[in-house]
Curated annotation (Swiss-Prot):
Key words of the record: Capsid protein, Inner capsid protein, Virion
A GO term, aspect molecular function: structural molecule activity
Subcellular location, principal: virion
Name of the protein this chain belongs to: Outer capsid protein VP2
Protein source organism: Epizootic hemorrhagic disease virus 1 (EHDV-1)
Length: 971
């Protein structure tokens, strides 16, 4: 076949046999040339679009019915074929390239069985493709540029989102559970006596007591989550512990789906204990416990299997003893409540401890949530209503304690908080140190020591517990590195910020007093995080829910430049600073924080000239200005922290002096490498450049394809990892191998760069509970500390570690001999890191498939967008290659479409023998663009009074054939 013909029609009266069946591609326009708006493409036969707040783009689950496609398979297959002909085939390398891509897509196609065509929708109509052509498709969202825009891949607008470079955060919130109601049974006189101490301060002593008791329920005031402004003052008094309380389960009009399913199963079980509902129970519990922002835990299937075995026994009364029988026979309790009690008891028994709302597996989270729905304060209700107590044999020391507490709080994500002004919540308030105050001498470095300030007598100090630290070192010497918990395991118990859980620590006791933890309303100062923390009752000052940068309480939002210092997911909520909706046809204002970033860019003289100038009165570009600059600053921060670990001779070579000062947080010295750092496309590439620059003497960057190859060989190369490091970084490798037997601090330092390499993939699978050993340089000694990166949250693991890397030795202590405990543990630590198996997210994970959705959002901040579908026609003669075709919707521009195709096939440019682009515009107009050694024209065809168009592409001697191209290339 020496030419290609495509049809374009809009007449429904045309028989498909005439305009579709005999053509490889047919385009059916919408009636009257109409176009759908972006929001109208939701849930159609096209690429996956999501609705909701833009800030949740990486938190939403994917929609059912969409299938994964891998557009890069064609490029990878051709490279594989070319390498095979050269005898340089590497199956593992090519597989890794596909698995590490972040450009996969999810599509919902429709198969027209009668006409053997795959039907896909664009805004302007339907594309009907032969299945052999459809295997090469890729969708693209093309953002239209305004006057100062630059929408090029070098902006890394999606990469900065994945790396957390435009995230903001703030302390999380807590409020009364929606399933509970608090009744006021009296006032609280908190202090029996008052006296003055020697400093003249008033000290309150004695236990609180209840006064003005109200015994009749009908006369008691109450609050629940649904209160209005008339009860805000009462809620404030309750949260301030001025009221005595009783707690009831709140009835709801309609249960959510999973709870309703479990209720029905419970009623069936009460009638027949042999009913086969085990699989249905598990399915509903997992549904109830699933959280869109959480990765599925590695042990999810194992936990479900354990639960399946035990619940099957319990439901059939085959359990030893009469606990299930007694629960089922309890009088005066609803059937659903009895069922929930049996499920809860089963869950606790299989893990041998009490379970809670923050469990790592979905089945246990769902189990607790269902029990909470039915029982309210679950362990108190189990003891009071079913005479079941937490077992003394459990491992959590909860027996006799937790079942006396009525826990009433739930965590509320700050960014999802929708409360009226003057309402109250509990909130973590976080205050960072003044960045201008931290001036460091290069000779002395920045070493960790516990906080000491003028206010240290009035606050709690977050610090390492020497006894717990010594116990951990002893375990390492015996077992190697097998630590699962993070830093909290070596921190003093009363200040363990890393493991505080206010939902467990705040409760109503048996007497009716609201009990808050010892750390409540106390400042906790931490030099590890360079911040002060306090949880207090706060008032809502704004109900705004559009811009994450808008404050809802009096305290501040933490910007992207400070967030890396505080990797505490248990007390901090984090979101991309995306304002507005994800899927909309309207232009949107970007976040106020982005305006601040642009102002900071204009003041940054070292790098501003590398950007398109910001024009007065013209809105700057989110991709070209905000994302690019935010990513640059994130990379610069990592560069300036890790450069302090360079060999001493390299530092002296770069600085020409040993005694100089720098600001720990405002240091921008990167030895005139600003432009190189700006253009690096990933954090991994940055770490590679740091090693090249510091150890190999390399002054320029490598190509991004080479960085990708290094990334896959080192991070996912298994046993070949050491050989890969030696191949690409030979000087660094020699120093790294000496870490295991380090004698002094200088010998230790290369380990930090190796750790950074392994932790620099934002698509790492963080689902398995574990911690990594990092080196913490302290004033009194060098310590090894456990840091958790596996938090079941998607994100860059390195951001959980940079706050430890910021502590670094000064130049004068580089030759200081290491203490014996570190020397003895180093072999175990080094072996752990060398053998560490990094696991990547699945090819279909949302981080790998949301690039186009994010591009669509970015376009609403600029000039809008249009969409394209591109695919290829294989050429077999005279030279193998392909012709690329692009079909675009209203506003499509041929030159931009061609650029997008060349972006897709950048690694196989020589295989492109021609490109033609068809833009379907309004009022039945068709735009045609072509390049390369082909010719294209639009023909008008009339057949039995029907009229339509044909796009004819002359191949100039080339022969279109080679069906099943990708299938053959990948086999």
């Amino acid at each position: 076949m020496e030419d290609i013909n495509l049809t374009i029609f809009s007449d429904d009266a045309l028989p498909h046999a005439v305009v579709v069946d005999d053509y490889v591609i047919a385009i059916k326009r919408n009636p009257n040339g109409t176009f759908l708006e972006p929001h109208q493409m939701y849930d159609r036969y096209t690429q996956e679009f999501l609705q909701g707040k833009a800030r949740d783009v990486l938190r939403q689950n994917g929609r059912d019915g969409y299938k994964l496609i891998i557009p890069e398979a064609l490029s990878t297959g051709i490279i594989r074929y070319e390498n095979k002909t050269k005898g340089a085939q590497s199956e593992v390398e090519l597989e890794n390239q596909l698995r590490s891509s972040i450009r996969h897509q999810r599509v919902k196609p429709r198969m027209d069985e009668a006409h053997r065509k795959l039907q896909i929708e664009l805004r302007g109509g339907q594309i009907l493709l032969h299945p052999r052509i459809a295997e090469s498709i890729e969708f693209s969202i093309i953002s239209k540029e305004n006057a100062t825009c630059s929408h090029t891949p070098v902006n890394c607008a999606y990469e900065v989102l994945l790396s957390g470079g435009i995230n903001v955060g703030t302390g999380t919130c807590y409020d009364l559970s929606s399933r509970l109601k608090l009744r006021v049974i009296g006032d609280v006189d908190r202090h029996r006596r008052s006296m003055q101490n020697v400093l003249g301060r008033v000290i309150h002593t004695g236990d609180p007591k209840i006064i003005n008791r109200v015994n009749q329920i009908g006369s008691q005031q109450f609050i629940d989550r649904a209160i209005g402004p008339d009860k805000f003052e009462l809620k404030r008094e309750i949260f301030d512990r001025l009221k005595a309380l009783d707690v009831d389960v709140r009835k709801v009009i309609r249960e959510e789906e999973a709870s309703a399913e479990l209720d029905e199963m419970g009623r069936r079980w009460m009638r027949d204990q042999n009913v086969n509902i085990v699989n249905d129970i598990i399915q509903s519990l997992v549904k109830k416990g699933s959280r869109s922002e959480k990765l599925a835990h590695r042990n999810e299937q194992g936990m479900q299997a354990r639960f399946r075995r035990t619940i099957a026994t319990n439901l059939r009364d085959q359990r030893q003893g009469k606990e299930v029988l007694n629960i089922r026979g309890t009088r005066g309790q609803p059937e659903e409540k009895k069922f929930a009690a049996v499920l809860l008891m089963t869950g606790c028994d299989i893990v041998e401890r009490a379970i809670w709302s923050n469990e790592e597996t979905a089945i246990l989270r769902g189990l607790y949530a269902y029990a909470h729905d039915k029982l309210g304060c679950v362990y108190r209700a189990m003891k009071k209503d079913f005479v079941w107590s937490i077992r003394p044999t459990y491992t959590d020391r909860c027996a006799g304690v937790c079942d006396r507490k009525r826990t009433i709080m739930v965590r509320e994500d700050y960014f999802d908080l929708q409360r009226e002004e003057n309402d109250s919540v509990y909130k973590w308030i976080i205050t960072e140190w003044d960045k201008n105050d931290v001036i460091i001498s290069a000779k002395n470095g920045y070493l960790y020591s516990k906080y000491s300030g003028e206010d240290e007598d009035d606050i709690l100090v977050h610090e390492i517990d020497d006894r717990l630290y010594t116990a951990m070192i002893d375990r390492i010497l015996i077992n190697g590195w097998i630590e699962k918990e993070g830093l909290s395991q070596i921190i003093k118990e009363e200040v363990r910020l890393e493991s505080f859980d206010f939902t467990k620590d705040a409760y109503v006791d048996e007497a009716g007093f609201l009990v808050l933890p010892e750390y409540y309303d106390r400042v906790i100062a931490s030099n590890i995080y360079d911040c002060k923390f306090k949880i207090s009752r706060v008032s809502i000052t704004s109900s705004s829910n559009d811009d994450p940068w808008d404050k809802k309480t009096a305290d501040s939002i933490i910007d992207e430049q400070c967030l890396w210092k505080i990797p505490l997911p248990n007390i901090i909520d984090v979101r991309p600073c995306f304002r507005g909706d994800l899927l909309t046809s309207n232009s949107q204002e970007y976040s106020k924080r982005f305006s601040g970033i642009i102002d900071e860019l204009k003041k940054d003289k070292e790098i501003y000239d590398d950007f398109i100038p910001v024009q007065e009165g013209v809105r700057p570009c989110v991709q070209g200005h905000v994302c690019r600059y935010a990513f640059y600053r994130q990379k610069l921060t990592i560069f300036t922290i890790l450069k302090r670990y360079y060999p001493i001779e390299r530092i002296l070579e770069l600085t020409d002096e040993e005694d100089y000062e720098y600001n720990l947080y405002l240091d921008k010295e990167c030895y005139k490498k600003e432009s190189l750092i700006l253009n690096l496309r990933s954090i991994f590439s940055l770490i590679c450049f740091l090693i090249d620059f510091g150890y190999e003497g390399r002054e320029i960057t490598r190509g991004e394809d080479e960085y990708l190859k290094i990334f896959n060989e080192i991070n996912y190369g298994g046993h070949a990892r050491k050989e890969a490091i030696n191949k690409y970084f030979p000087q660094f490798y020699q120093r790294l191998m000496r870490v295991r037997t380090s004698e002094n601090i200088e010998d230790l330092l290369p380990l930090a760069f190796y750790q950074a390499l392994l932790l620099s993939d934002p698509c790492t699978d963080n689902s398995e509970k574990s911690s990594h050993p990092l080196i913490l340089f302290c004033q009194d000694k060098v310590r090894v500390v456990p840091i958790r990166t596996a938090t079941q949250e998607r994100g860059l693991p390195l951001l959980c570690c940079i706050h430890i890397f910021k502590f670094h030795p000064g130049l004068q202590m580089r030759k200081k001999e290491l203490e014996d405990d570190i020397k003895k543990t180093l072999p175990a630590i080094f072996d752990y890191w060398i053998e560490l198996e990094m696991k990547r997210l699945d090819t279909g994970d949302r981080l790998r498939t949301r690039a186009q959705m994010v591009e669509l959002y970015y376009s609403t901040n600029c000039g809008g967008s249009y969409e394209t579908l591109n695919f290829v026609f294989p050429i077999v003669h005279p030279n193998k290659g392909f012709i690329a075709c692009v079909i675009s919707s209203k506003g499509g521009m041929g030159a931009l479409n061609e650029d997008d195709v060349r972006r897709r096939f950048r690694r196989i440019q020589s295989s492109i023998q021609g490109i033609f682009s068809i833009s379907i515009d309004e009022e039945m107009e068709i735009q045609l663009h072509h390049s390369g050694n082909i010719q294209a024209r639009i023909l008008e065809k009339v057949f039995f009074e029907h009229k339509w168009h044909i796009v004819q592409v002359k191949l100039n001697g080339k022969i279109f054939e080679n069906h099943e191209l990708i299938t053959k290339l990948m086999n």
